From Swiss-Prot:
Biological processes per GO annotation: proteolysis
Organism: Fasciola hepatica (Liver fluke)
Record-given protein name: Cathepsin L1
Entry's EC annotation: 3.4.22.15
Recorded family membership: Belongs to the peptidase C1 family.
Keyword annotations from UniProtKB, A to Z: Disulfide bond, Hydrolase, Lysosome, Protease, Thiol protease
Primary enzyme class: hydrolase
Any one GO molecular function term: cysteine-type endopeptidase activity
């Protein structure tokens, strides 16, 4: 996935979508 921003509190999640 290409995240707009990565939330370090939600590791493995980008813009609310799980990046696999």
């Amino acid at each position: 996935a290409v995240p707009d921003k990565i939330d370090p509190r939600e590791s493995g999640y980008v813009t609310g979508v799980k990046d696999q």
